[in-house]
Structures are given as structure tokens and as C-alpha cells.
């Protein structure tokens, strides 16, 4: 079975079981450990996966990461797990502390459904505030699977991942901005169209006038793109 098929099996399992998972430990056993195994690591081999690895800081003792993926006796990926219904926004500072205390270049914060991948692009050994990759197991794209595959034991290459991490991180932020403005164009986004259609001039009144038109126009463009792709697909089938 190839990697994609294995991941799809895990996705089906998550969809069926997510409402029955009562604890964080159950989340780890049912959702997270199968993903680690799918990445080619033996979860019962301490040379590959260390559960509850110490990540102590000078002023904080007893800090432990849920899982550390190992290579050549060094951690390469830290995984901090939460219950599958937990909001991950509440827990990123915890992973930041663990990241500083280790030599790993990558950290993952997950609730077994959403996986947020972090590294230290801005300052060495200081985890970035923004993840460079966010994967939702219940809304998985082919590209998500390809990005996950880069962390597979057989394909893992730290420099290759780092070389694409910044682009991925920026892509996430651009998509978030576009999504916000597609839902409700803000003043700056709307002014772009006002200026370009009025010889560089704009007023608050024009911005308010254009805002619903911009929103409607975006929806029409998206619908046109979808219709064009469907028409092409139908022609290819015929």
C-alpha cells in the first residue's frame, strides 16, 4: 500500500471515530500514532520515536514533549498533541518552549485532525509564530499529502523541507488574506479597485459604494472559473 492510500485509511478512521474520542491519550493512540507509523517510523522503537521526551528549560523543569521523532540519536521533529476537540490556538506557546529546549528543526502541534508544522525561519532555535504548513486530515488535498510525505523516514531531507518552508508559510498567509477579503473586502483591498477605475482617485464614499460590488465580482469570477473547469472535464470525458 502506498503512502497516499495509508493516509486515506487514517482519514476514514478519524471521520468515523472523532466523536467517540474522550481523552487526549485516546487521541494520541487512535489518530496520532497511526500517522507517525504512516511516516515510516516504528512507534515502539526508542531509536525512532521517543514518547514523553524531556524538554527542560533552565527555569522550567519536568517539561516533556509527547513525541520526538529521532534520527541518528537526535530529535528532528517534535510532536505536541491535544484532544481532538481542542482549539490549537490555545497551545502554541507550549510547543515554542519545547522547541527552544531541543535541537529539532521542526515542531508539530496537533489535535489528531489538524496538524500545524513549525520551524525557525526568522531566528535560529526560536520557533516561528506562524506555521509553514497546516494540514487538516478531514479536508486533505493531494498537495497536503505530498507535503506530509516529505517527513517520511524514507524521504526526509531537512534542507529540502526548509527550502520550501518559507514559500509555504507565505502562501498560508496570502490565502488567509484573500479568504478574508473574498468574504468581506476591507478598505485597503477595495481601494485598489477604486483607484484603478477612477484615475487614482478615491473617497470614503466610493470605497463604501465599491465594496459590495467587489465582493459580488469576486464571487462571479470564482463561479466562472469553476464552470470553465467543469466544462473542460465534461468535454474530456466525452
Feature map (PLM): residue ranges:
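A short, conserved, highly charged catalytic patch centered on acidic carboxylates
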Residues: 1-106, 116-238
Amino acid at each position: 500500500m502506498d503512502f497516499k492510500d495509508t493516509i486515506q485509511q487514517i482519514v476514514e478512521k478519524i471521520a468515523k471515530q472523532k466523536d467517540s474520542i474522550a481523552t487526549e491519550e485516546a487521541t494520541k493512540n487512535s489518530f496520532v500514532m497511526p500517522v507517525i507509523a504512516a511516516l515510516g517510523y516504528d512507534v515502539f522503537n526508542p531509536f525512532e520515536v521517543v514518547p514523553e521526551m524531556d524538554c527542560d528549560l533552565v527555569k522550567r523543569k519536568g517539561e516533556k514533549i509527547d513525541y520526538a521523532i529521532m534520527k541518528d540519536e537526535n530529535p528532528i521533529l517534535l510532536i505536541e498533541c491535544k484532544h481532538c476537540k481542542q482549539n490549537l490556538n490555545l497551545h502554541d506557546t507550549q510547543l515554542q518552549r519545547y522547541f527552544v529546549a531541543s535541537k529539532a528543526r521542526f515542531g508539530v502541534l496537533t489535535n489528531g485532525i489538524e496538524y500545524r508544522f513549525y520551524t525557525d525561519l526568522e531566528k535560529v532555535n526560536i520557533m516561528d509564530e506562524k506555521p509553514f504548513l497546516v494540514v487538516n486530515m478531514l479536508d486533505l488535498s493531494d498537495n497536503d499529502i505530498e507535503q506530509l510525505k516529505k517527513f517520511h523516514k524514507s524521504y526526509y531531507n531537512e534542507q529540502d523541507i526548509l527550502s520550501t518552508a518559507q514559500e509555504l508559510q507565505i502562501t498560508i498567509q496570502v490565502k488567509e488574506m484573500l479568504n478574508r477579503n473574498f468574504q468581506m473586502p476591507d478598505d485597503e483591498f477595495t481601494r485598489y479597485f477604486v483607484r484603478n477605475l477612477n484615475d487614482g482617485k478615491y473617497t470614503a464614499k466610493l470605497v463604501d459604494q465599491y465594496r459590495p460590488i467587489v465582493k459580488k465580482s469576486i464571487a462571479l469570477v470564482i463561479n466562472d472559473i469553476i464552470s470553465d473547469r467543469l466544462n473542460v472535464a465534461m468535454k474530456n470525458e466525452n
